[in-house]
């Protein structure tokens, strides 16, 4: 049998120790494998080696503490030899909405010097179709002494595959283990090797396909979500125009056995749903009309929210605006592509009033929000003329809605509106 399939993967390297990479490394370490985490962020590396975490994810702190103290997990800024390399680095898009693969290229150049015959390289980063093949090409440029799948196919020295993460922030540790995984190797043997690696910790099914299908699968999943969210967001704007409560409307419409409308919000954020559909649009701009339109609807929703805040602010001489929530979804600290950040930043730029922020999951505001105060809920409410709910954190559900009676409330998530409807 091929060595890459027989190999026991005793030593595994995870490149990129963020919201996906660190939990993945930790789960693998819990299977008593030696995990070498690699990140260019020295603070993250030092924090992990002190058995602490630099991100917020339920229960991750306990697992990292155990993995580091037992000697199964350590972090470094420089790659070291391993049997398998999992690349989990960001894949943003450029200003023209084209994919930016510079982080993947940098990861390839970083690990190339320590590769040896029989190693497996898996790209976990959500990527445009063809990125796994490009990764193989970048690796081969650095290591002419080794062969890669795009050169020799099944006979290559190095195995390369794509296995996109498909977890929900706040539930990452459970979903890493329980969710099905899509594994797309550049060759069948690449797929077999990657499948063997993921079966070390995945209890869900490991479904094997080719690399390009695996890449497109993740993009499709997120585009599907984006289109459905766009429907809900557009519906919320229509309901505002015609005087219908969108939260009640969705609640009763979803009583139909074949209708499942999602909940609207202030936009769409995060590093997946707000980004990945553009990879499809970039690949097939003439055909991806619905996907493009959905992105445009969701990208426009923060401006719609801002218009409502502007209208409310005109009622006050010196308005104080309290914004509840900054993260891109509830109960996490991840601010990437957050529509709430865009909304708050624009409020400040347009000088709509004094802007306060309540975000229980962070201790320091991003530098882009200069001039904004970070407060707890009670002092923010005491000072506010206008209250804008941007993220439906669980902690905000406990707020006494009677405190909102004398204030202008813009509830973009329906949390307080739905609570009043149910009362």
UniProtKB/Swiss-Prot annotation:
Gene name, Swiss-Prot/TrEMBL: epsD
Organism per entry: Ralstonia solanacearum (Pseudomonas solanacearum)
Any Pfam family matching the protein: UDPG_MGDP_dh_N
Positions of the catalytic residues: 218 (proton donor/acceptor), 272 (nucleophile)
Phylogenetic lineage: Bacteria, Pseudomonadati, Pseudomonadota, Betaproteobacteria, Burkholderiales
Leading EC class: oxidoreductase
Source taxon at top rank: Bacteria
Segments traversing the membrane: none
Protein name: NDP-N-acetyl-D-galactosaminuronic acid dehydrogenase
PANTHER family from the UniProt entry: UDP-N-ACETYL-D-MANNOSAMINE DEHYDROGENASE (PTHR43491:SF1)
């Amino acid at each position: 049998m091929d060595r890459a399939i027989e190999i026991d993967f005793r030593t595994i390297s995870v490149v990129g120790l963020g919201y996906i990479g660190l939990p993945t490394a930790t789960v693998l370490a819990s299977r008593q494998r030696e995990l070498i985490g690699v990140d260019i962020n020295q603070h993250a590396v030092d924090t992990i080696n002190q058995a602490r975490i630099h991100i917020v994810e339920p229960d991750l702190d306990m697992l990292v503490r155990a993995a580091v103290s037992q000697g199964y997990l350590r972090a470094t800024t420089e790659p070291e030899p391993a049997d398998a390399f999992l690349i989990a680095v960001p894949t943003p898009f450029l200003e023209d909405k084209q994919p930016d693969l510079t982080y993947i290229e940098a990861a390839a150049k970083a690990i190339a010097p320590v590769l040896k015959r029989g190693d497996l390289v898996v790209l976990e980063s959500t990527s445009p179709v063809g990125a796994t093949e490009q990764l193989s090409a970048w690796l081969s440029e650095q290591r002419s002494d080794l062969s890669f799948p795009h050169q020799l196919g099944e006979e290559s020295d190095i195995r390369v595959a794509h296995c996109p993460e498909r977890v929900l922030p706040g539930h990452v540790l459970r979903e890493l283990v329980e969710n099905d995984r899509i594994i797309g190797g550049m060759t069948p043997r690449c797929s077999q090797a990657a499948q063997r690696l993921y079966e070390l910790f995945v209890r869900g099914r490991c479904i094997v396909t080719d690399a390009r299908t695996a890449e497109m699968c993740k993009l499709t999943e997120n585009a599907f979500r984006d289109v459905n969210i766009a429907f809900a967001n557009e519906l919320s704007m229509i309901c505002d125009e015609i005087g219908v409560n969108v939260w009640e409307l969705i609640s009763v419409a979803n009583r139909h056995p074949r209708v499942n409308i999602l909940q609207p919000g202030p936009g769409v954020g995060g590093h997946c749903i707000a980004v990945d559909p553009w990879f499809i649009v970039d690949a097939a701009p003439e055909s991806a009309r619905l996907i493009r339109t959905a992105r445009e609807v969701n990208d426009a929703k923060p401006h719609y929210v801002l218009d409502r805040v502007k209208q409310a602010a005109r009622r006050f001489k010196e308005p104080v605006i309290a914004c509840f929530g900054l993260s891109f979804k509830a109960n996490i600290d991840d601010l990437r592509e957050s529509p709430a950040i865009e909304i708050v930043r624009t409020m400040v730029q347009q000088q709509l009033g004094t802007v306060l922020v309540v975000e229980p999951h962070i201790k320091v505001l991003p530098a882009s929000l200069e001039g904004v105060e970070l407060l707890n809920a009670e002092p923010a409410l005491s000072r506010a003329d206008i209250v804008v709910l941007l993220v439906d954190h669980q902690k905000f559900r406990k707020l006494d809605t009677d405190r909102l009676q004398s204030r202008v409330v813009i509830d973009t998530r329906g949390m307080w509106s739905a609570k009043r409807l149910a009362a």
